[in-house]
């Protein structure tokens, strides 16, 4: 499944309705995971946009980013969409404020030579796409539209 970098803020912060891109982070403290894609994206943006200036604050893990966001020590977090969705469930009070602005594909690693296993995994994935299971699971667990439970239930009824 695909993902990408997003921006998250504290739900009740003054930035909850104003930050939509890294350009909007001018003058703010931006949390990223040390050495990760979030750091590379935030730093590259600064390098390519000299008119924008924000302080990059690096953390050993994304939990530290979110913890300091909620504590008010940083203003915004750059994180992977899927990772942030999980963290937002565990640490209430954060809000994703934009769609992914990078593209990242996720994969399942299979040991070289395990062709039967690879074929089985690919067949399962194809089946999930074909019968609507993938879309229902995405909506139920990832999509924040608020209609996740209803869409997943409809897909289950169709599959039965």
PLM region spans:
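Flexible hinge/capping segments at coil-to-helix
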Residues: 9-29
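Ligand-binding clefts/hinges and TM-proximal coupling segments of bilobed small-molecule sensing domains
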Residues: 37-57, 89-97, 125-160
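Short beta-strand->loop
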Residues: 25-35, 59, 111
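Alpha-helical elements of the RecA-like P-loop NTPase motor core of helicases
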Residues: 39-40, 66-67, 85-86, 119, ...
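Surface-exposed, polar/charged faces of alpha-helical domains
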Residues: 13, 20, 51-54, 71, ...
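Beta->alpha turn/N-cap motifs
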Residues: 10-11, 33-36, 61-62, 77-85
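Short helices/loops that flank or line small-molecule/ion binding pockets
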Residues: 20-24, 44-48, 57, 62-78, ...
